[in-house]
Amino acid sequence: RCTVNDVKAAVYAVRNRTENVENRTNDFSMRPEQKEAVDKTEAYFRSAAAEGYPKFLWNCKMRFGKTFAAYQLAKRMGFKRVLVLTFKPAVVSAWQEDLNTHKDFEGWQFISRTTELTYETADQSRPIVCFGSFQDYLGVDKTTGTIKGRNEWVHTINWDLVIFDEYHFGAWKENAKKLFEQDDEDDYDSENMEQYSRADAYDETWLPITTNHYLYLSGTPFRALNSGEFIEEQIYNWTYSDEQRAKENWQGEHNPYAALPRMVMMTYKIPESIQQIAKQGEYDEFDLNVFFSANGKG
Protein backbone atom coordinates (compact mmCIF):
# COMPACT_ATOMS: atom_id res chain seq x y z
CA ARG A 1 0.00 0.00 0.00
CA CYS A 2 1.17 3.52 -0.82
CA THR A 3 1.57 6.11 1.90
CA VAL A 4 1.02 9.83 1.49
CA ASN A 5 4.77 10.34 1.37
CA ASP A 6 5.08 7.69 -1.35
CA VAL A 7 2.62 9.62 -3.48
CA LYS A 8 4.39 12.91 -2.80
CA ALA A 9 7.71 11.34 -3.76
CA ALA A 10 6.22 10.01 -7.00
CA VAL A 11 4.76 13.42 -7.88
CA TYR A 12 8.11 15.04 -7.18
CA ALA A 13 9.90 12.49 -9.39
CA VAL A 14 7.55 13.09 -12.33
CA ARG A 15 7.56 16.86 -11.96
CA ASN A 16 11.35 17.09 -11.77
CA ARG A 17 12.09 14.21 -14.14
CA THR A 18 14.23 12.37 -11.64
CA GLU A 19 14.21 8.84 -10.25
CA ASN A 20 14.08 10.20 -6.68
CA VAL A 21 15.46 6.95 -5.31
CA GLU A 22 15.54 8.41 -1.80
CA ASN A 23 11.83 9.27 -1.93
CA ARG A 24 12.34 12.94 -1.10
CA THR A 25 9.14 14.94 -0.84
CA ASN A 26 10.17 18.56 -0.15
CA ASP A 27 11.48 21.06 -2.66
CA PHE A 28 10.69 24.44 -1.09
CA SER A 29 13.20 27.27 -1.25
CA MET A 30 14.66 29.38 1.52
CA ARG A 31 12.63 32.36 2.64
CA PRO A 32 14.34 35.76 2.21
CA GLU A 33 15.45 35.97 5.85
CA GLN A 34 16.90 32.45 5.74
CA LYS A 35 18.90 33.30 2.64
CA GLU A 36 20.05 36.52 4.31
CA ALA A 37 21.25 34.55 7.34
CA VAL A 38 23.15 32.11 5.13
CA ASP A 39 24.66 34.93 3.05
CA LYS A 40 25.83 36.89 6.08
CA THR A 41 27.27 33.83 7.80
CA GLU A 42 29.06 32.62 4.70
CA ALA A 43 30.60 36.05 4.17
CA TYR A 44 31.80 36.20 7.78
CA PHE A 45 33.18 32.66 7.76
CA ARG A 46 35.17 33.33 4.62
CA SER A 47 36.48 36.71 5.77
CA ALA A 48 37.45 35.54 9.26
CA ALA A 49 38.88 32.15 8.33
CA ALA A 50 42.46 33.42 8.38
CA GLU A 51 42.03 34.70 11.95
CA GLY A 52 41.29 31.30 13.46
CA TYR A 53 38.07 29.36 13.89
CA PRO A 54 35.16 31.75 13.26
CA LYS A 55 31.89 31.47 15.17
CA PHE A 56 28.48 32.92 14.35
CA LEU A 57 25.16 33.19 16.20
CA TRP A 58 21.68 32.97 14.72
CA ASN A 59 19.40 34.77 17.15
CA CYS A 60 16.19 33.77 15.41
CA LYS A 61 12.66 33.23 16.65
CA MET A 62 11.07 29.83 16.94
CA ARG A 63 9.88 28.43 13.58
CA PHE A 64 12.50 30.44 11.71
CA GLY A 65 13.73 27.24 10.12
CA LYS A 66 17.20 27.26 11.63
CA THR A 67 17.74 23.56 10.92
CA PHE A 68 16.95 23.84 7.21
CA ALA A 69 18.95 27.05 6.84
CA ALA A 70 21.95 25.55 8.67
CA TYR A 71 22.00 22.68 6.19
CA GLN A 72 21.82 25.17 3.33
CA LEU A 73 24.81 27.00 4.82
CA ALA A 74 26.77 23.75 5.01
CA LYS A 75 25.93 22.97 1.40
CA ARG A 76 26.81 26.50 0.26
CA MET A 77 30.20 26.30 1.99
CA GLY A 78 30.91 22.86 0.57
CA PHE A 79 31.14 21.24 4.01
CA LYS A 80 31.29 17.42 4.03
CA ARG A 81 31.52 16.70 7.76
CA VAL A 82 29.01 18.44 10.04
CA LEU A 83 28.60 17.77 13.76
CA VAL A 84 25.38 18.90 15.44
CA LEU A 85 25.53 19.14 19.23
CA THR A 86 22.34 19.90 21.07
CA PHE A 87 21.35 20.57 24.64
CA LYS A 88 17.88 19.10 23.97
CA PRO A 89 18.20 15.69 22.28
CA ALA A 90 14.46 15.58 21.54
CA VAL A 91 15.03 17.80 18.48
CA VAL A 92 16.74 14.94 16.63
CA SER A 93 13.61 14.26 14.54
CA ALA A 94 13.65 17.77 13.04
CA TRP A 95 17.31 17.53 12.05
CA GLN A 96 16.84 14.08 10.54
CA GLU A 97 13.63 14.91 8.69
CA ASP A 98 14.96 18.09 7.08
CA LEU A 99 18.04 16.29 5.80
CA ASN A 100 16.28 13.14 4.60
CA THR A 101 13.22 14.66 2.92
CA HIS A 102 14.45 17.74 1.04
CA LYS A 103 15.74 17.44 -2.51
CA ASP A 104 18.61 19.85 -1.87
CA PHE A 105 20.31 17.31 0.39
CA GLU A 106 20.03 14.22 -1.78
CA GLY A 107 22.99 11.98 -1.09
CA TRP A 108 23.62 13.41 2.38
CA GLN A 109 23.78 10.95 5.27
CA PHE A 110 22.41 11.38 8.80
CA ILE A 111 23.91 9.60 11.79
CA SER A 112 22.69 9.52 15.38
CA ARG A 113 22.47 7.00 18.21
CA THR A 114 19.08 5.87 16.88
CA THR A 115 20.07 5.27 13.24
CA GLU A 116 21.34 1.99 11.84
CA LEU A 117 23.92 3.92 9.84
CA THR A 118 27.16 4.57 11.69
CA TYR A 119 30.15 6.68 10.75
CA GLU A 120 32.15 3.55 10.01
CA THR A 121 29.53 2.17 7.60
CA ALA A 122 28.69 5.52 5.95
CA ASP A 123 29.88 6.38 2.44
CA GLN A 124 32.89 8.58 3.17
CA SER A 125 32.71 10.16 -0.28
CA ARG A 126 29.36 11.79 0.50
CA PRO A 127 28.45 14.51 3.05
CA ILE A 128 27.82 13.26 6.58
CA VAL A 129 25.85 14.92 9.38
CA CYS A 130 26.36 13.49 12.87
CA PHE A 131 23.86 14.41 15.57
CA GLY A 132 24.25 13.95 19.30
CA SER A 133 23.71 15.50 22.69
CA PHE A 134 26.42 17.70 24.14
CA GLN A 135 26.43 15.55 27.26
CA ASP A 136 27.02 12.33 25.34
CA TYR A 137 29.53 13.29 22.66
CA LEU A 138 31.62 15.61 24.81
CA GLY A 139 31.08 13.99 28.18
CA VAL A 140 33.56 11.79 29.98
CA ASP A 141 33.36 8.35 31.51
CA LYS A 142 32.86 8.88 35.23
CA THR A 143 34.93 5.80 36.01
CA THR A 144 38.00 6.54 33.91
CA GLY A 145 37.69 10.30 33.50
CA THR A 146 38.38 9.92 29.79
CA ILE A 147 36.26 10.26 26.66
CA LYS A 148 33.54 7.63 26.40
CA GLY A 149 34.80 4.73 24.31
CA ARG A 150 31.81 4.65 21.99
CA ASN A 151 32.42 8.31 21.08
CA GLU A 152 36.15 8.30 20.43
CA TRP A 153 35.56 8.54 16.68
CA VAL A 154 33.91 11.96 17.16
CA HIS A 155 37.19 13.32 18.46
CA THR A 156 39.37 11.90 15.69
CA ILE A 157 37.66 13.86 12.91
CA ASN A 158 38.42 17.43 11.92
CA TRP A 159 34.85 18.66 11.37
CA ASP A 160 34.07 21.28 8.76
CA LEU A 161 31.33 22.73 10.95
CA VAL A 162 30.11 22.25 14.51
CA ILE A 163 26.57 23.44 15.22
CA PHE A 164 25.34 24.14 18.76
CA ASP A 165 21.56 23.84 18.71
CA GLU A 166 19.30 25.23 21.46
CA TYR A 167 22.32 27.14 22.71
CA HIS A 168 20.34 29.07 25.32
CA PHE A 169 20.07 25.88 27.40
CA GLY A 170 23.81 25.67 27.82
CA ALA A 171 25.15 29.18 27.52
CA TRP A 172 25.02 30.44 31.06
CA LYS A 173 26.10 27.85 33.57
CA GLU A 174 28.09 28.97 36.58
CA ASN A 175 30.61 26.39 35.43
CA ALA A 176 29.89 25.39 31.83
CA LYS A 177 32.17 22.37 31.87
CA LYS A 178 29.96 20.66 34.46
CA LEU A 179 27.59 19.85 31.63
CA PHE A 180 30.03 17.19 30.48
CA GLU A 181 29.36 15.23 33.64
CA GLN A 182 25.57 15.25 33.36
CA ASP A 183 24.06 12.04 31.99
CA ASP A 184 20.48 13.25 32.42
CA GLU A 185 19.48 16.37 30.52
CA ASP A 186 16.76 17.05 33.10
CA ASP A 187 19.42 17.25 35.80
CA TYR A 188 21.05 19.98 33.80
CA ASP A 189 17.93 21.93 32.88
CA SER A 190 16.77 22.16 36.48
CA GLU A 191 19.98 23.70 37.76
CA ASN A 192 20.11 27.33 38.80
CA MET A 193 21.15 29.36 35.75
CA GLU A 194 20.65 32.86 37.11
CA GLN A 195 24.34 33.69 37.34
CA TYR A 196 26.09 34.32 34.05
CA SER A 197 29.14 36.12 32.82
CA ARG A 198 31.15 35.98 29.65
CA ALA A 199 33.66 33.76 31.42
CA ASP A 200 30.95 31.13 31.90
CA ALA A 201 30.15 30.84 28.20
CA TYR A 202 31.52 28.06 26.07
CA ASP A 203 35.11 28.56 25.07
CA GLU A 204 35.90 26.73 21.85
CA THR A 205 39.53 26.36 22.89
CA TRP A 206 38.71 23.67 25.47
CA LEU A 207 36.25 21.66 23.41
CA PRO A 208 37.84 18.22 22.89
CA ILE A 209 37.06 18.28 19.17
CA THR A 210 38.61 19.98 16.17
CA THR A 211 36.67 22.00 13.63
CA ASN A 212 37.01 24.94 11.29
CA HIS A 213 33.73 26.77 11.98
CA TYR A 214 31.14 27.14 14.76
CA LEU A 215 27.46 27.99 14.34
CA TYR A 216 25.26 28.74 17.37
CA LEU A 217 21.47 28.49 17.10
CA SER A 218 18.99 29.92 19.59
CA GLY A 219 15.68 31.70 19.77
CA THR A 220 16.44 33.31 23.14
CA PRO A 221 20.20 33.87 23.58
CA PHE A 222 19.63 37.00 25.66
CA ARG A 223 22.28 36.39 28.27
CA ALA A 224 24.90 35.44 25.69
CA LEU A 225 24.11 38.69 23.87
CA ASN A 226 24.20 40.82 27.00
CA SER A 227 27.54 39.35 28.03
CA GLY A 228 29.25 40.38 24.82
CA GLU A 229 30.09 36.80 23.89
CA PHE A 230 29.42 37.66 20.23
CA ILE A 231 30.25 40.87 18.42
CA GLU A 232 27.78 42.52 16.06
CA GLU A 233 29.44 41.06 12.96
CA GLN A 234 28.91 37.56 14.38
CA ILE A 235 25.14 37.79 14.85
CA TYR A 236 22.11 37.48 12.63
CA ASN A 237 18.81 38.54 14.23
CA TRP A 238 15.27 37.67 13.19
CA THR A 239 12.50 38.54 15.65
CA TYR A 240 8.72 38.21 15.76
CA SER A 241 8.49 41.87 14.82
CA ASP A 242 10.68 41.28 11.77
CA GLU A 243 8.42 38.44 10.72
CA GLN A 244 5.25 40.50 11.09
CA ARG A 245 6.82 43.33 9.14
CA ALA A 246 7.79 40.95 6.34
CA LYS A 247 4.27 39.56 6.27
CA GLU A 248 2.75 43.03 6.01
CA ASN A 249 5.17 44.31 3.36
CA TRP A 250 5.22 41.25 1.08
CA GLN A 251 4.67 42.13 -2.57
CA GLY A 252 3.12 39.73 -5.06
CA GLU A 253 1.44 36.36 -4.73
CA HIS A 254 2.31 33.38 -2.56
CA ASN A 255 3.20 35.26 0.59
CA PRO A 256 5.28 32.75 2.61
CA TYR A 257 4.19 34.49 5.81
CA ALA A 258 0.46 34.43 5.06
CA ALA A 259 -0.26 31.45 7.30
CA LEU A 260 1.51 32.99 10.28
CA PRO A 261 -0.79 34.43 12.94
CA ARG A 262 -1.00 38.13 13.59
CA MET A 263 0.91 39.06 16.70
CA VAL A 264 -0.29 41.66 19.16
CA MET A 265 2.18 42.95 21.74
CA MET A 266 0.83 44.73 24.78
CA THR A 267 2.69 46.61 27.47
CA TYR A 268 1.73 47.69 30.95
CA LYS A 269 2.74 51.02 32.42
CA ILE A 270 3.51 50.78 36.11
CA PRO A 271 1.63 53.44 38.10
CA GLU A 272 3.69 56.32 39.44
CA SER A 273 2.88 55.31 43.02
CA ILE A 274 4.41 51.88 42.50
CA GLN A 275 7.47 53.41 40.83
CA GLN A 276 8.04 55.64 43.83
CA ILE A 277 7.94 52.65 46.17
CA ALA A 278 10.44 50.80 44.01
CA LYS A 279 12.79 53.78 43.85
CA GLN A 280 12.97 53.99 47.64
CA GLY A 281 15.10 50.87 47.73
CA GLU A 282 18.87 51.02 47.49
CA TYR A 283 18.87 48.89 44.35
CA ASP A 284 16.42 48.05 41.61
CA GLU A 285 15.83 44.48 42.69
CA PHE A 286 13.18 43.38 40.18
CA ASP A 287 14.48 40.63 37.90
CA LEU A 288 12.45 39.06 35.08
CA ASN A 289 14.50 35.88 35.33
CA VAL A 290 13.54 35.51 38.97
CA PHE A 291 9.94 36.54 38.29
CA PHE A 292 9.49 33.73 35.74
CA SER A 293 11.75 31.17 37.40
CA ALA A 294 10.40 27.73 38.28
CA ASN A 295 11.52 25.08 40.71
CA GLY A 296 11.50 21.33 40.30
CA LYS A 297 11.38 19.06 37.29
CA GLY A 298 8.66 18.24 34.80
Where on the chain are the PLM-derived regions?
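Conserved nucleotide-binding/hydrolysis micro-motifs of P-loop NTPases
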Residues: 89-91, 135-139, 168-169, 219-224, ...
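Conserved Walker A/P-loop ATP-binding site and its immediately adjacent core
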Residues: 67-103, 136
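Inter-Walker segment of RecA-like/P-loop motor cores
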Residues: 103-145
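Walker A (P-loop) phosphate-binding loop of P-loop NTPases
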Residues: 63
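ATP-dependent helicase/translocase motor core
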Residues: 1-59, 68-80, 97
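SF2 helicase catalytic motif II
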Residues: 134-136, 152-215, 220-221
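Short basic/glycine-enriched coil/helix segment immediately N-terminal to the Walker B
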Residues: 50-53, 123-126, 143-160, 206
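Interdomain helical connector at the RecA1-RecA2 junction of SF1/SF2 helicase-like NTPases
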Residues: 213, 224-298
